Amino acid sequence: MELRMKKVSVIAAAVAATLAAGSAFAVDFHGYMRAGVGVSADGGQQVTFEKQKIGRLGNEGDIYGEIQLGQEVYNNNGKTFYVDSMIAVTSNGSNDWEGTASNCGTTVSHPDGQDPSATTKCVDDAEFALRQFNVQAKGVLDFAPEATLWAGKRYYQRHDIHISDFYYWNISGAGAGVEGIEAGPGQLSFAWVRNDRNDNFKLGENNPGDTPDAGNDGGAANVNTLDLRYAGLPVWENGSLELGLNYALVNETDDASDAAKDAKDGVMFTAELTQGLDSGFNKTVFQYGTEGYSKTMAFYGDGSWYGAEANDGASGYRLINWGVIGMGQNWEMGHQLVYGVGEDMWDGQDKLETMSVVVRPMYKWDDNHKTIFEAGYAIDDNDGAENKFGKLTVAQAWSAGSSFWARPEIRVYASYLTADKDDNSNAFDGGRSDDTFQFGVQAEAWW
């Protein structure tokens, strides 16, 4: 009996040690996903059309996911080190097997094999991306033990509107910084992030927009973004202010093109007022940008890409209001209002104005069942040439809770999309129609 009890004690101790070790090395698992299936009344798969301007509900034809794994690897005397990582994947959901080698080098004329003249490397395949890989250290700065010192690649203090997937302040990328320094009533953060200019962007007949730099890794102009923010400044009851300044430094090499050498550094200023409400919140944002940041204001940019090819003296600004509020026991509504201006961005261009209105009211039948409506309308006016876009969506949804933000959620939807373009071109059905209907089912989750 005594021997048996000793064996039990040894086993219990081993199990306890294993559990303790598992707790010490527990990995934080977070993520996001959206996926589904949809068709267009014109034939073929559903489309994704101007969702930042007219809303994303019933207007996403892709599959997208993020897998985030992180772990605290050191904790001693108030000092911690955390390693974070994230892989993202996107595809159009056309097949069961979607990978980086799917249908590579094939064309319509060579559907079953390699086409030696093909310029497209892969068709209808999945794309994988390294989105985050960084180290975050807390308690290591003697002058600010509450702050976080970080380096690597990361999502950095992103600001977005969920109902349109519109990121209006987001310089994420590879970099380093210190965030969360207590300074008076708020917190101060500073970062340096690399945001090289993609030289494939083209806009304007007389200005191709390319800023190639053969001497830089990747062949595009090297842009370094310096970011300074002061957040959490109380202004009145339930109201707080965040202020930010971004400086884009174009760092060309001797082998850079003339366009890259002529590119000017730019400044983007952001002020965001957040108002807490009894049944939700509201945010009002003002942004102003010079030089390449003028295009950020005009084309729903977020600051992570810099329009280095913009004309010298270009400028722009943007006003945004968005939020989510409860309206009684069963109704909630999200909205966005956007007005942006870009001026003198390329030769012959004077003023581009963009306006967007999106509303998403939701009725909750019970804790897990809701009906969602979304309507969006947008106008782009470039020196009198107007493009108008619209969308109406109705969806029945089942979610893990009744909140506007409750996820996972499965939704069945029907959408009507329309486009009225200044050049009379058609946006749908391969250029044969100016409107379309689509129907589908989508799941969305974050954890």
UniProtKB/Swiss-Prot annotation:
Oxidoreductase recorded as keyword: no
GO annotation, cellular component aspect: cell outer membrane; pore complex
Keywords tagged on the record: Cell outer membrane, Ion transport, Membrane, Porin, Signal, Sugar transport, Transmembrane, Transmembrane beta strand, Transport
GO molecular function: maltodextrin transmembrane transporter activity; maltose transporting porin activity
SUPFAM superfamilies, per database record: Porins
Catalysed reactions listed for this entry: beta-maltose(in) = beta-maltose(out)
CDD domains from the UniProt entry: Maltoporin-like
GO terms under biological process: monoatomic ion transport
Reported induction: By maltose.
Highest taxon listed in the record's lineage: Bacteria
Site residues, Greasy slide, important in sugar transport: 32, 64, 97, 281, 405, 446
Keyword Mitochondrion included in the entry's annotation: no
Pfam families: LamB
Compartments reported by the entry: Cell outer membrane
Site (Important in sugar transport): 167
HAMAP family, sorted: LamB
NCBIfam families per record: PRK09360.1 (NF006860)
SUBUNIT field: Homotrimer formed of three 18-stranded antiparallel beta-barrels, containing three independent channels.
Role, per record: Involved in the transport of maltose and maltodextrins.
Family note: Belongs to the porin LamB (TC 1.B.3) family.
Protein name: Maltoporin
Organism: Vibrio campbellii (strain ATCC BAA-1116)
Name of encoding gene: lamB
